Design a protein with these regions (language model features):
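PLP-dependent class I/II
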Residues: 1-205
Length: 205
């Protein structure tokens, strides 16, 4: 059963987070939830400048819907606030004129980092890293019993040649924390040289 069928059958709202749409590595055409015919009034699309333009912390985005009732309800919340931060607005507006060539360079760089990181991770005994189809992070299975404890240990009690690694325990990314107990989330936002150093430190840990 397709998502559209579920939305129609159970009369659901489909909240579609599409902030990573520029970073899809499958070579397939990007399909927005708004392209699904028959559920136009049920779709609420969420977008942001923070991922596309590497502006983490800039809380500027959009909530888009064709449903007037949803729109009116959202506007009540919007009008209860003065505005998004001024500096964020200025930065976001300037970002909209970013050349397409730059976006293509960023895409190619993330793709190269992804391929490098996945290859390095899967060479470490006991580690499994699936190849993500988009975004710039990966959920990694580690040969440990509890990644919450392991991540804390790496920060407080471990170093290799004066360096350590900081990772996000996987338990925080699941409705059932047990599903991520042996996983960590890694972002490939560093250059390949630094990623290589981090993988050496992780292997030693």
């Amino acid at each position: 059963m397709q998502i559209r069928d579920l939305v129609q059958k159970y009369i659901l709202y489909l909240f579609s987070d599409e902030v990573y749409r520029e970073f899809i590595y499958t070579k397939r055409p990007y399909i927005s939830a708004f392209h699904l015919e028959g559920i136009e009034q049920n779709v609420v699309l969420i977008d942001s400048v923070s991922k596309r333009y590497s502006e983490c912390g800039i809380r500027i985005g959009a909530l888009i819907t064709k449903n007037k009732e949803v729109h009116n309800a959202v506007m009540k919340f919007c009008q209860a606030r003065l505005s998004p931060p001024l500096i964020g607005q200025v930065i976001a507006e300037a970002s909209l004129s970013t050349p397409q060539e730059y976006m293509e360079e960023v895409y190619d760089e993330y793709l190269a980092r992804r391929n490098f990181l996945i290859d390095q991770l899967n060479q470490i005994p006991g580690v499994f890293a699936p190849t993500p189809m988009g975004a710039f992070y990966v959920m990694v299975q580690l040969p440990v019993d509890d990644t919450d404890q392991f991540c804390q240990w790496c920060l407080t009690d471990f170093q290799y040649e004066g360096q350590t690694v900081m990772m996000a325990p996987g338990s925080g990314f699941y409705t059932n924390p047990e599903q991520g107990k042996k996983q960590v989330r890694m972002a490939y936002i560093l250059n390949k040289e630094d990623l290589g150093k981090a993988m050496l430190v992780l292997k030693k840990a």
